[in-house]
From Swiss-Prot:
<dbReference type="GO" id="GO:0006364">
    <property type="term" value="P:rRNA processing"/>
</dbReference>
<dbReference type="Pfam" id="PF04135">
    <property type="entry name" value="Nop10p"/>
</dbReference>
<dbReference type="InterPro" id="IPR036756">
    <property type="entry name" value="H/ACA_rnp_Nop10_sf"/>
</dbReference>
<comment type="function">
    <text>Involved in ribosome biogenesis; more specifically in 18S rRNA pseudouridylation and in cleavage of pre-rRNA.</text>
</comment>
<dbReference type="GO" id="GO:0030515">
    <property type="term" value="F:snoRNA binding"/>
</dbReference>
<dbReference type="InterPro" id="IPR023532">
    <property type="entry name" value="Nop10_arc-typ"/>
</dbReference>
<protein>
    <recommendedName>
        <fullName>Ribosome biogenesis protein Nop10</fullName>
    </recommendedName>
</protein>
<comment type="similarity">
    <text>Belongs to the NOP10 family.</text>
</comment>
<dbReference type="InterPro" id="IPR007264">
    <property type="entry name" value="H/ACA_rnp_Nop10"/>
</dbReference>
<keyword id="KW-0687">Ribonucleoprotein</keyword>
<dbReference type="GO" id="GO:1990904">
    <property type="term" value="C:ribonucleoprotein complex"/>
</dbReference>
<keyword id="KW-0690">Ribosome biogenesis</keyword>
<dbReference type="GO" id="GO:0001522">
    <property type="term" value="P:pseudouridine synthesis"/>
</dbReference>
<keyword id="KW-0698">rRNA processing</keyword>
Amino acid sequence: MRFRIRKCPKCGRYTLKEVCPVCGEKTKVAHPPRFSPEDPYGEYRRRWKREVLGIGRKEK
């Protein structure tokens, strides 16, 4: 399934275009990535979050 709706990170408007018609900024897909229980990169993403944000459990 291909997502069509996009959002401008600068002005926050939704559009179907690759470039925002209001401010000219490149738009991004407005949908979050699909969830999978077998996420092969989930461990690395959670570790990065703990290191950068300083939250969650600490590794020994």
